[in-house]
Regions:
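Conserved short alpha-helical segments that host acidic/polar catalytic motifs at enzyme active sites
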Residues: 1-171
């Protein structure tokens, strides 16, 4: 089972995201990652294995954003790997997900038919691409999510981080 967390604060979010994810370690996981918003741009770090691997990566490549989302992954679609670790992102949105998107293969085929390129084996990546399509059509972030949710079948929890969003606005 996955763990998801979102933080909005007055200082760098990544250390707090790691602390929060440590509290979720008992749930089990095979990889972890965080994304933050820095100067309106999404940045993320991911690692396979234990949170210590992600902590080491963040020590080498810190994130300064004060708003962020984090995730510990227990693989349901796609093998454990850094590439399949959450958050999944496009240039416009990062998403973390707990649950299963039962119709992800169908959605993925539809997106690929429209020219969308996938970089993971996960069901979660379809969510990022569907929301991005809505954003490109001019939908505000909340409306992009509202338009995407009815397309998804399954049981799930989601947290999003949007590029260009001001500090203090997250959608969990």
């Amino acid at each position: 089972m996955c763990g998801i967390i979102g933080i909005i604060g007055g200082e760098a979010a990544a250390p707090h995201l790691i602390d929060a994810l440590k509290r979720l370690e008992y749930r089990g996981y095979d990889s972890a990652g965080v994304a933050t918003l820095e100067n309106g741009k999404l940045t993320r770090r991911r690692a396979e294995g234990k949170l210590k691997n992600l902590e080491n990566r963040l020590a080498r490549e810190p994130l300064a954003g004060r708003i962020g989302i984090g995730h510990t992954r227990w693989a349901t679609h796609g093998r454990p790997s850094e590439n399949n670790a959450h958050p999944h992102a496009t240039e416009k949105v990062a998403v973390v997900h707990n649950g299963i998107i039962e119709n992800f293969a169908e959605l993925r085929r539809e997106l690929e038919h429209r020219g969308v390129k996938f970089s993971t084996e996960t069901d979660t990546e379809v969510i990022a691409h569907l929301v991005t399509e809505e954003l490109k059509r001019g939908a505000p972030p909340v409306d992009a999510v509202k338009s995407t949710l009815p397309l998804l079948r399954g049981a799930f929890a989601l947290a999003f981080l949007f590029a260009g969003e001001e500090i203090g606005r997250a959608h969990v």
